[in-house]
């Protein structure tokens, strides 16, 4: 799931890259936290995602909670819409979780477009 606040092309790239990121069945939910409803709705329709929210800016955390509220999947991934998934990367993240059942939260290695490591998890 992702929280979209007036996304541009990054939402389209995010959704398009998900197909190669996993061989698993995906349920994709977008919390619409901004005013670009047409952009969010069109991208969701192209990629089989569901949109929740009416564009009210609830803040990131409340938007994420809204998107996750009705999910019953074993794994819930919260990702920013400016992320581009590498092929197999979501499978690798879920496999790490399966290999470490005591883990309550997992964080992937994030890379900048130039390949350098982004300092996440600060």
Regions found by a protein language model. Give the residues of each.
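Conserved short acidic donor-positioning loop in nucleotide-sugar-dependent glycosyltransferases
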Residues: 18, 32-36, 58
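The conserved acidic donor/metal-binding loop of glycosyltransferases
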Residues: 80-84
